[in-house]
């Protein structure tokens, strides 16, 4: 599996479903995503300090945002503490970033169905590199926000990575590929903040830019095209016309872009696809909200310092990476629905333990269950969705899924923070834990594509 014979940085021909080629594609995707996500996560431990610096500089744009944050904090009854303010401010910036991904993901997916995965991937990575360059070359809050906007619009590489995995021929490889993408996320969110904590605010954007450029060159040299010309969408106009259906959340939940395509799935498969999309949205809406409020709970109830919170998230990331690298990637094809259903149900006691914990062992047990479930759900759902649609629809379908996830991540933290401060931690975590039963029940009796194919 060495790369010595392919030293030149020339575009690769479309791959055929050969196991060695598929393994190589997955390795390239893993390393490329790891570089990209390390660039993104370096900032996380430094965000509170960065926001405080802009506040001290009395940046006018920062001041207007701060007034909005103060109004929202007052409306939900949040205490006027600097630490809470930083978490809320950073969460709102993160929600805006996710909202931009909600709009851009279906467009990149539809474009890649017509143009191929490689060129659209390179365009996305170029946009990400530009976003870090804008941030690195200016110290103003305006430049920081501009970099987040450019980065949010350009963050199509994750969606494209799932589409590339969906292009691969064998179901076991697709399942392993989705799990490996999850491992890249877990490792990056474990290692990136640790590395960022040792860097200065001035150095981080330059290191992120270095990672982004390295990622761009690496993908250009080693990623083959996985969507052959004969399997692509017949018209870019058709692709963008169907993608326009995704700007409405309701159309997105109906998978309207797939329904109006030239080769729509059978009605029962379309119903399954819509149900999976709803499960994905509800899961990430609830999960991202509770994940966001963990910082509030850890500080309010356990008086965790920033360092202790960093250790908590390191424990979560390490547990997730271990589960994804061992258990999740070995889930047999056709067994994803059962694994995801069990993991979804596990989140109910996990968040009940966290929300009602008054001792560190109880909190640790809740976090362990939470990490196990989180390691399984998204890769499993992604694998299931990747089984739907023709080769020329995979990018659009995975783009829809990423859009639904981005919408959930945009709305979840705002809603969960409001419930947390208006009703308290125990009510917030209890209600949200119970609500996980809704996606669980939606998924419980869903038939896997392999089963429906047998019936046909």
Swiss-Prot record:
Transmembrane feature ranges: 25-45, 87-107, 114-136, 179-199, 203-223, 278-298, 311-328, 345-365, 366-386, 403-423, 424-444
Keywords of this entry: Apoptosis, Cell membrane, Glycoprotein, Membrane, Nucleus, Transmembrane, Transmembrane helix, Transport
Positions bearing carbohydrate: 159
Record's bilayer topology term: Multi-pass membrane protein
Cellular localisation: Nucleus inner membrane; Cell membrane
GO CC annotation terms, alphabetical: brush border membrane; cytoplasmic vesicle membrane; nuclear inner membrane
Tissue occurrence: Esxpressed in luminal membrane of renal tubules. Expressed at the surface of eosinophils (at protein level).
Family annotation (Gene3D superfamilies): MFS general substrate transporter like domains
Key word Protease present: no
Presence of the UniProt keyword Zinc in the record: no
Superkingdom field: Eukaryota
Family affiliation: Belongs to the major facilitator superfamily.
Function summary: Probable organic anion transporter which may serve as a transporter for some non-steroidal anti-inflammatory drugs (NSAIDs) as well as other organic anions across the luminal membranes of renal proximal tubules at the final excretion step into the urine.
Record protein name field: Major facilitator superfamily domain-containing protein 10
Species per Swiss-Prot/TrEMBL record: Mus musculus
């Amino acid at each position: 599996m060495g790369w010595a014979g392919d030293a030149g940085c020339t575009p690769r021909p479309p791959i055929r479903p050969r196991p060695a080629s598929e393994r190589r594609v997955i390795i390239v995707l893993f390393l490329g995503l790891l570089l990209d996500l390390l660039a993104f996560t370096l900032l996380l431990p430094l965000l509170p300090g960065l926001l405080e610096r802009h506040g001290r500089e009395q940046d006018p744009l920062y001041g207007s945002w701060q007034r909005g944050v103060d109004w929202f904090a007052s409306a939900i009854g949040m205490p006027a503490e600097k630490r809470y303010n930083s978490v809320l401010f950073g969460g709102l910036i993160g929600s805006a970033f996710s909202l931009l991904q909600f709009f851009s993901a279906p467009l990149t997916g539809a474009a890649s169905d017509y143009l191929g995965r490689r060129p659209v991937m390179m365009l996305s990575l170029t946009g990400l590199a530009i976003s870090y360059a804008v941030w690195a070359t200016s110290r103003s809050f305006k430049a920081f926000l501009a970099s987040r906007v450019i980065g949010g619009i350009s963050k199509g590489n994750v969606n494209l990575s799932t589409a590339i995995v969906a292009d691969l021929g064998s179901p076991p490889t697709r399942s392993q590929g989705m799990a490996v993408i999850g491992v890249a996320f877990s490792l990056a969110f474990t290692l990136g903040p640790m590395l960022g904590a040792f860097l200065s605010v001035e150095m981080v954007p330059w290191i992120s830019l270095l990672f982004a450029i390295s990622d761009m060159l690496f993908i250009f040299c080693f990623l083959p095209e996985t969507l052959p010309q004969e399997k692509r969408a017949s018209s870019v106009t058709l692709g963008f016309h169907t993608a326009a259906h995704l700007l409405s959340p309701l159309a997105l939940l109906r998978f309207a872009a797939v329904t109006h395509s030239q080769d729509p799935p059978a009605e029962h498969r379309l119903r399954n696809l819509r149900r999976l999309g709803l499960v994905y949205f509800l899961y990430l809406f609830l999960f991202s909200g509770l994940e966001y409020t963990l910082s509030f709970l850890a500080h309010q109830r356990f008086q965790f310092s920033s360092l202790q919170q960093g250790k908590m998230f390191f424990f979560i990331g390490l547990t997730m990476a271990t589960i994804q690298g061992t258990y999740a990637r070995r889930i047999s094809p056709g067994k994803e629905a059962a694994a995801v259903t069990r993991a979804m149900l596990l989140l109910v006691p996990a968040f009940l333990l966290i929300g009602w914990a008054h001792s560190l062992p109880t909190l640790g047990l809740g976090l362990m269950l939470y990490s196990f479930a989180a390691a399984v759900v998204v890769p499993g759902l992604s694998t299931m969705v990747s089984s739907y649609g023709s080769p020329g629809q995979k990018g659009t379908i995975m783009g829809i899924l990423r859009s639904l996830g981005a919408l959930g991540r945009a709305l979840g933290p705002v809603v969960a923070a409001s419930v947390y401060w208006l009703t308290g931690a125990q009510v917030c975590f209890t209600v949200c834990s119970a609500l996980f039963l809704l996606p669980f029940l939606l998924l419980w009796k869903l038939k896997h594509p392999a089963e429906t194919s047998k019936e046909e």
